[in-house]
């Protein structure tokens, strides 16, 4: 069984995954972490990106410069689609290998699993972690040491998660992309309180899923 954990920036996805790992012993695959590692592990991936984007992403000694790629993505939305078209096949193969190494229940953590066509019908159960936008922004600023404007830009890039946070996701027509994506969610965990409260919510959600 693949349990997907998703949510917007600062929602507490990683906290939920740690609770699941500690309580149930399920291995966790962090898509965001693995993608960052791909840039080091697979030089051919960087070769493909540099060719597709027609720019250098490594310095003179061959070290990947994430800030360069981030700047390209931030300044041009089309760059993100190009990057995803190159990276997602690596992610798919890597996760398939992870599942083979870990028979049984596994957790797939990703912020974008509901918003990308690549992940359509992905996973057996989906947990969405949510919190008020202001709380998510404050958490992300403290965690990353980033300024508020930069964090807000990342929040704005997750429209579905914002629609969930402000409650407007239920206002969309049933045939809209937002409504279809949200319909995949099996459990919503609101992470706006203490760690004890969060742990109780996670245990309740998992116990229901595993019946």
Segments from the language model and where they lie:
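ATP-dependent NMP and nucleoside kinases share a basic, alpha-helical "lid"
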Residues: 94-100, 106-143
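P-loop (Walker A) phosphate-binding loop of NTP-binding proteins
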Residues: 8
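Small-molecule kinase domains that catalyze NTP-dependent phosphoryl transfer to phosphate-bearing small molecules
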Residues: 120-121, 142-209
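ATP-binding Walker
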Residues: 11
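Hydrophobic anchor at the beta1->P-loop junction of P-loop NTPases
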Residues: 3-5
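ATP-dependent small-molecule kinase phosphotransfer cores
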Residues: 33-104
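Walker A/P-loop
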Residues: 14
């Amino acid at each position: 069984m693949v349990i997907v954990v998703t949510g917007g920036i600062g929602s507490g996805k990683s906290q939920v995954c740690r609770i699941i790992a500690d309580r149930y012993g399920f291995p966790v695959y962090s898509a965001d972490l693995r993608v960052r590692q791909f840039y080091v592990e697979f030089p051919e991936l960087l070769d493909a990106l540099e060719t597709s984007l027609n720019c250098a992403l490594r310095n003179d000694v061959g070290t990947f410069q994430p800030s360069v790629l981030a700047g390209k993505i931030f300044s041009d939305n089309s760059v993100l689609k190009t990057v995803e078209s190159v990276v997602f096949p690596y992610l798919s193969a890597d996760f398939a290998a992870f599942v083979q190494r870990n028979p049984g229940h596994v957790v797939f953590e990703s912020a974008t699993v509901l918003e990308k066509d690549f992940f359509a019908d992905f996973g057996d159960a989906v947990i969405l972690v949510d919190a008020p936008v202001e709380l998510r922004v404050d958490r992300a600023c403290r965690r990353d040491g980033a300024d508020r404007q930069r964090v807000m830009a990342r929040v704005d890039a997750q429209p579905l998660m914002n629609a969930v946070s402000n409650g407007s996701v239920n206002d969309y027509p049933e045939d809209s992309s937002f409504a279809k994506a949200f319909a995949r969610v099996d459990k919503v965990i609101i992470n706006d309180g203490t760690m004890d409260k969060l742990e109780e919510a996670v245990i309740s959600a998992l116990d229901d899923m595993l019946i």
